[in-house]
């Protein structure tokens, strides 16, 4: 996390484009990350915001080919490769992000990017390592369930919430999956 991330949470910083994207209709936003989640968030926000910057630390996207093509073909998405966010600024809410281009390189430079919204789309890892000894997980660490049920391969053991949900990662959906597990 960035030093001022919590200070601006709900005042320009968000971790959920589908939850907060409508606040940024016809505004300028940035999405941090280079994977599928970041591309999905950027694509969704592009339908609302006037401009979407994708801030990517690496010189390439880690996202699947189809997601890369989607963001690259969207006219109001601009990808800022080799940029690292170092801080946020603003008086009565978020006004921008401090960036370092090519950190640690000879041509490194720091600059500010004025934005209205800052969306975090990195570091989504399920908190499932405690259970990997007993339960099967996918390559990203999500606990595998049987079909669309919360049942795992271990009888009487259920997985609910974000540890079993690589797609939505929303509190209301996690609560619903908890209810499903309780009913099993």
Where are these regions (language model features)?
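Glycine-rich dinucleotide-binding loop and its adjacent helix/turn
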Residues: 1-48, 145-146
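Short amphipathic alpha-helical segments
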Residues: 1-4, 42-44, 66-67, 130-133, ...
């Amino acid at each position: 996390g960035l030093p001022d991330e919590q200070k601006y949470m709900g005042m320009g910083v968000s971790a959920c484009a589908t939850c907060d994207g409508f606040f940024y209709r016809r505004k300028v936003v940035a999405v941090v990350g280079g994977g599928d989640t970041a591309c999905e968030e950027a694509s969704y926000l592009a339908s609302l915001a006037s401009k979407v910057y994708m801030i990517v630390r690496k010189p390439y996207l880690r996202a699947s080919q189809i997601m890369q093509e989607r963001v690259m073909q969207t006219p109001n998405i601009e990808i800022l490769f080799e940029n690292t966010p170092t801080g946020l600024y603003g008086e009565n809410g978020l006004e921008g992000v401090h960036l370092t281009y090519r950190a640690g390189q000879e041509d490194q430079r720091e600059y500010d990017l004025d934005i209205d919204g800052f969306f975090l789309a990195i570091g989504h890892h399920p908190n499932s390592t405690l259970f990997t000894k007993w339960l099967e997980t996918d390559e990203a660490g999500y606990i595998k369930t049987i079909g669309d049920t919360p049942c795992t391969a271990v009888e009487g053991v259920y997985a609910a919430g974000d540890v079993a949900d690589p797609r939505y990662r929303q509190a209301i959906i996690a609560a619903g999956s908890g209810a499903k597990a309780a009913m099993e």
